[in-house]
């Protein structure tokens, strides 16, 4: 049976700027172990090693060293997004290994993800972690106000939906830290980390969902009212068009009637004139 860690509490970080990679690493470790400066240092170290390899290759291939020194970092973007290599190196400090879910070594996890302890998910510039804590699975996406509990059945469905949407998924393997002293964690959390009981996390999510539902209801009501107005406008236009058609038909009929009457009157006048001439 898995031992309860951190007194049964969940560690969650809410999105701050573009620091989702930092949030992802810390929620994998379940504690504020890394800051953005720590990951930036890891990225700089990787950049230095990569440039050294490129310089050595330049000497063999006849390229100028300046061709590579001007290269931008491939491990951290100007917006603060870190590469998977940075996350891998950071987790290696804790003797954890990161491997792609679609590689042959990960076949058991593909069949039964419940066997694992953590997944890292990445799409475009966003990272988040799915983690088993005290025997229960949670989605620690930093865009969420609190961790989202995932049932064992829903875990597989959720991972499949992410893969179908184009997300890259990695497994984290190794011996995860069991305890993170909360006294020191509050100092290192940079104000975006929080410890929550599973009950508190559920309560926060329900309150957030209720607020979102109310906003969505108001938005939907507005959309529905706009649609009703548009439908009413279309009906009015159609009725007006039909009215115009009826009026046009009536006007044409009246015009034809007037023309017939005029012709009849004209014919009567002509006949009367002829009879007058005969009498003369």
From Swiss-Prot:
Its EC number(s): 3.4.19.12
InterPro entries linked to this entry: Ataxin-3 (IPR033865), Josephin (IPR006155)
Domain UIM, chain residue ranges per copy: 243-262
One GO cellular component, as annotated: nucleus
Catalytic activity: Thiol-dependent hydrolysis of ester, thioester, amide, peptide and isopeptide bonds formed by the C-terminal Gly of ubiquitin (a 76-residue protein attached to proteins as an intracellular targeting signal)
Location of the active site: 20, 126, 141
A single GO BP: protein deubiquitination
Keyword Protease listed: yes
Composition bias, Polar residues: 183-194, 221-232
UniProt keywords, alphabetically: Hydrolase, Nucleus, Protease, Thiol protease, Transcription, Transcription regulation, Ubl conjugation pathway
Presence of keyword Transcription: yes
Enzyme class name: hydrolase
Cell location: Nucleus
Molecular function per GO: cysteine-type deubiquitinase activity
Principal subcellular localisation of the protein: nucleus
Ranges for region Disordered: 183-240
Domain Josephin: 7-187
Pfam families: Josephin
Sequence intervals crossing the membrane: none
Biological function: Interacts with key regulators of transcription and represses transcription. Acts as a histone-binding protein that regulates transcription. Acts as a deubiquitinating enzyme.
Name the UniProt record assigns to this protein: Ataxin-3 homolog
Species assigned in the record: Arabidopsis thaliana (Mouse-ear cress)
